[in-house]
Amino acid sequence: MALQQTLLITGASSGFGRALAQAALAAGHRVVGTVRSAQARQEFEALGAGAIGRVLDVTDVEAIPGLVAELEATVGPLDVLVNNAGYGHEGILEESPLDALRRQLDVNVVGAVAMMQAVLPSMRQRRRGHIVNITSMGGFITMPGIAYYCGSKFALEGISEALGQEVAALGIHVTAVAPGSFRTDWAGRSMVRTPRSIADYDALLDPIRDARQAKSGRQRGDPAKAAQAMLALIEAPAPPAHLLLGSDALALVRDKLDRLKADIAAWEAVSRSTDA
């Protein structure tokens, strides 16, 4: 068995967070999971002796430093932070209120950054640690109707990569994990949908929305297998800066990169024309 580590996983009540917690506990690690209610905390701690629950809303950024300090004092050093808390927003950009964008960024980006800032001092002092940010293939590719969500995941991908460069010499690893479509509740009850109002977009979005809802719960990706992949990542001595999960993510991101390379080549002369 790999050396026992203590993981702090946000959003541990369901989806990837719960699957990773179960896999890590089975592998002999300790897991602190943040959840949104006292009942969810009880359910999480029932997973096993190594499961430690805490109630936290990641948008309450002022509460995060105190929580991390309390955990370090009572549980011990936190070896791995997994920023998993998040949700998806679906809506045409023109129809979606700015408050929906602010909420999306508060949960998916600001909360994750606050968690990173809270664990970094101890990791930096110990010259050891691993931060894993669960992003999405939507942090590399885009599709109509999830502009706010993709924007939040593009942001977290960039933040993860830049932070990794800042802390690499300090013994701290940062990995952005980008899953494809998995059998989680992302497209189900956890997704926030802005009501439709502009008929011009019906032909574009309605089929996409219908297909997404029809596929929910039947996606190819298996959360339990994703958890094993993330566990291997956490236990790796030299983890990557980016990790895609799922054959769909591989295919779609490779296609995006090919199209990006083609655009760069087609417009290379214009790009170079701006040099003095």
What does each model-identified segment do?
Residues S13-S14:
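Conserved glycine-rich cofactor-binding loop
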Residues L56-G66, L98:
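The beta1-alpha1 cofactor-binding region of Rossmann-like NAD(H)/NADP(H)-dependent oxidoreductases
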Residues E70-N83, H89:
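A glycine-rich helix->loop->beta "capping" turn
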Residues I92-L93, P97-R102:
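Substrate-binding pocket helix/loop in short-chain dehydrogenase/reductase
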Residues M116, S152:
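Active-site helix of classical SDR
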Residues S136:
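Residue(s) in the substrate-gating loop at a strand-loop-helix junction
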Residues A169-P240:
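SDR active-site lid
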